[in-house]
């Protein structure tokens, strides 16, 4: 097998069996991580590493792996990227590092307000309302796991309202004993609003319109873009223009609405509700949902049918270890998911495909142009979808190191039309050739008519459990 020097540290790795046509130096983390672990096991130098991430209400996620006890560049890269992935998949304000002290000392500098991962530390502090902490201990002193295990929806009894808040419209549904009796979609423009009353009145008015169709309201469930923790909006573009002094009032809009209605109410991030809608539709658990839209959104239902309350902000989680990968403008990091599974990925690949579009075109319009080229049978356009499909094929087993799933739901505008078929076909090809042990364990789904009909708002309505 030919070997290709991929990284600045000259780690010699077998290249991917299937190369991405428009991104020759794409370095799948799953190949790097396996190679690293195999090497330290073969040399007999592996020691345990346990990472614990503490988030709201004492909840804690644990992740166990092995490392070399020295601070060589390969080990630092292996551990730093895993921490980065865990922060954005699980979330947390306190990181318990149960492993070699030399590695902890090095990474503590990175994960600080003065380090290279300042963005990540600030976002975690904002999401959880606590200063970000990095503490070192021995592996056996990392606290035991404590997950939230919220039974994932499917509660259809009674008179319920579900809503789904997006960036340009919101949907509301009235559901009586599982039957949808009212549904409505309303445009809005929350991003530019400076007054928190705008969000409160829009959502409240929608709930009242749905309530008017039912004899009573027993429960309200919601789905919203952004980071939702404990029924509060902690980070969201929906509140982008709210001034700092009004932010806490705006963030507590759901708690304020619950006080008005005095019924069980639960709001979750839209990614988890997408996975829930899929789980209810296919009647299976262990679902990871990946939406390729303006960014990458994700959600997860575990194999016991629970929503774990993880962050699942995979737009920021690394999926390419090529040090020269495209840098995400917001986080300042290379190889983040949004640059591989969204309209941003399409835009990134256009120059490599030698497709020139007018500079003034926004990302959604660029995707439409690409879809039009596909309809005309343009080979250059097909190469973009092939590349995204190969990214996905190598990322499915990478995600499987962090999520125990048997079903992957792929949705979003990037996956629609002829191009979407290529994405799925290429991903399956990679799995069969490179990961034959994983291929039979993961079934890929695209939203069918039933799933679309069910929709986010109806799935959200099934979240709260009724009080006896």
Residue ranges and their predicted role:
Residues 2-62, 74-75, 106, 116-118, ...:
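Glycine/GP-enriched mid-protein hinge/lid loop-to-helix segment characteristic of carbohydrate kinases
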Residues 52-55, 95-101:
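Structural motif
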Residues 68-80, 84-90, 101-138, 186-203, ...:
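Glycine-rich phosphate-binding loop and adjoining helix at the ATP-binding site
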Residues 89-99, 216-225, 403-414:
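Short glycine-rich phosphate-binding loop at a beta-alpha junction
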Residues 99-100, 155-156, 163-169, 290-295, ...:
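A short acidic Gly-Thr/Ser loop motif
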Residues 210, 387-405:
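Phosphate/ATP-binding catalytic cores across multiple sugar-kinase/actin-like superfamilies
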Residues 435-468:
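Conserved glycine-rich phosphate/nucleotide-binding loop
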């Amino acid at each position: 097998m030919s070997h290709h020097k991929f990284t600045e540290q000259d780690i010699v790795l077998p290249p991917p069996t299937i190369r991405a046509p428009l991104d020759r130096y794409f370095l799948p983390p799953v190949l790097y991580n396996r190679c690293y672990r195999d090497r330290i096991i073969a040399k007999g130098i592996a020691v345990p590493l346990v990472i614990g991430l503490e988030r709201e209400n004492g909840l804690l996620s644990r992740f166990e792996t092995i490392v070399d006890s020295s601070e060589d560049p390969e080990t630092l890269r292996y551990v730093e990227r895993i921490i980065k992935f865990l922060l954005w998949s699980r979330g947390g304000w306190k990181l318990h590092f149960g492993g070699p002290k030399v590695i902890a000392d090095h990474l503590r500098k990175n994960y600080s307000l003065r380090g290279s991962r300042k963005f990540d530390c600030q976002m975690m502090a904002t999401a959880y309302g606590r200063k970000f902490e990095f503490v070192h201990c021995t592996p056996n002193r990392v606290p035991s796991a404590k997950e939230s295990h919220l039974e994932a929806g499917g509660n259809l009894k009674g008179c319920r309202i579900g809503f789904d808040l997006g960036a340009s419209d919101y949907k509301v549904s009235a559901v009586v004993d599982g039957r949808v009796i009212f549904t409505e979609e309303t445009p809005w423009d929350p991003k530019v609003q400076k007054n928190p009353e705008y969000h409160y009145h829009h959502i409240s008015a929608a709930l009242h319109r749905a309530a008017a169709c039912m004899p009573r309201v027993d429960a309200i469930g919601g789905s919203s873009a952004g980071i939702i923790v404990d029924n509060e909006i902690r980070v969201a573009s929906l509140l982008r223009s709210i001034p700092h002094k009004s932010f806490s009032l705006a963030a507590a809009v759901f708690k304020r609405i619950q006080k008005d209605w005095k019924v069980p109410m639960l709001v979750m991030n839209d990614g988890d509700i997408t996975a829930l809608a899929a789980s209810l539709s296919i009647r299976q658990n262990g679902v990871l949902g990946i939406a390729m839209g303006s960014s990458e959104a994700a959600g997860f239902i575990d194999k016991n049918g629970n929503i774990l309350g993880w962050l699942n902000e995979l737009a920021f989680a690394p999926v390419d270890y090529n040090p020269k990968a495209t840098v995400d403008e917001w986080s300042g990091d290379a190889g983040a998911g949004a640059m591989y599974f969204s309209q941003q990925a399409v835009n990134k690949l256009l120059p490599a495909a030698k497709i020139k579009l007018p500079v003034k075109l926004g990302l959604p319009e660029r995707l439409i142009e690409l879809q039009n080229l596909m309809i005309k049978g343009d080979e250059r356009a097909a190469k973009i979808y092939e590349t995204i499909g190969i990214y996905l094929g190598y990322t499915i087993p990478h995600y499987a190191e962090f999520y125990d799933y048997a079903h992957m739901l792929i949705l979003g505008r990037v996956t629609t039309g002829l191009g979407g078929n290529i994405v799925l076909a290429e991903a399956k090809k990679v799995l069969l050739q490179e990961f034959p042990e994983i291929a039979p364990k993961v079934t890929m789904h695209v939203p069918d008519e039933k799933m679309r009909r069910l929709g986010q708002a109806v799935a959200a309505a099934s979240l709260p459990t009724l009080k006896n």
